[in-house]
């Protein structure tokens, strides 16, 4: 499956117009603004111009990092972040994942954006071996059978248990994408 950017033009297969594109950007920015998060991971963006337009449309003052990956589907990863709160120091694009490391407050935090569930296991295993001091957050597709084994907790589990999700399978909602956070990180909710 490969997505061709030319499909998203007025002459392309999907007949995208400037107004349709502007509506997509506005709606995406509105969702991001409603969450008011210092870090926002995006997967499946068409190109850097889309990321630039989303960041500009947000009320928050987001900086961004965009990477085109060597994947067959042509989709890219991006990270929107508040530059006064998060300072990226390293990024490593791979096949269907992007790893971004940086300073968040006094912590060194590693963000693994995964578009492939199997890849998440390898990325987590390697990062824990190579960079054990980094507080890890895994975002996206993940099939880690026991996140606790890697010092991670599933921040999406409670919502899924409450019947919320992103895909419906077997008559129930499930989270297709996960947020696995290092147990050493704390939030206002613990």
What are these regions (language model features)?
Residues 1-57, 61-75:
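N-terminal, active-site-proximal structural segment of metallo-dependent hydrolase catalytic domains
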Residues 128-135, 142-190:
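Metal-dependent phosphoester-hydrolase catalytic domains
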Residues 28-51, 113, 123-149, 180:
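Active-site beta-strand/loop signature of hydrolases that rely on acidic residues for catalysis
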Residues 1, 45, 116, 142, ...:
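Hydrophobic pocket-lining residues within nucleotide cofactor-binding pockets
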Residues 29, 119, 176:
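Histidine-centered active-site loop/cap adjacent to the catalytic His
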Residues 41-107, 111-116:
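Structured beta-strand-rich core segments of catalytic domains in phosphoester-bond hydrolases
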Residues 5, 15-22, 93-134, 138, ...:
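Acidic/His-rich catalytic or pseudo-catalytic neighborhoods
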């Amino acid at each position: 499956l490969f997505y061709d950017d030319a499909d998203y033009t007025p002459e392309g297969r999907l007949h995208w117009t400037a107004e349709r594109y502007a509506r997509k950007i506005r709606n995406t920015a509105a969702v991001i603004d409603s969450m008011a998060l210092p870090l926002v991971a995006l997967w499946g963006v068409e190109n850097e111009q889309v990321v630039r337009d989303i960041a500009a449309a947000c009320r928050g003052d987001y900086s961004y990092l965009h990477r085109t990956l060597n994947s067959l589907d042509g989709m890219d990863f991006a990270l929107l972040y508040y530059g006064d709160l998060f300072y990226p120091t390293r990024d490593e694009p791979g096949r269907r994942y992007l790893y971004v490391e940086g300073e968040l407050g006094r912590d060194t935090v590693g963000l693994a954006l995964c578009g492939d569930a199997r890849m998440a296991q390898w990325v987590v295993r390697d990062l824990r071996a190579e960079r054990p001091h980094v507080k890890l957050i895994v975002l996206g597709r993940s099939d880690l059978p026991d996140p606790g084994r890697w010092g991670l907790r599933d921040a999406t589990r409670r919502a899924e248990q409450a019947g919320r999700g992103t895909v419906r399978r077997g008559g129930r909602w499930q989270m297709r994408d996960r947020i696995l956070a290092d147990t050493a990180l704390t939030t206002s909710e613990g």
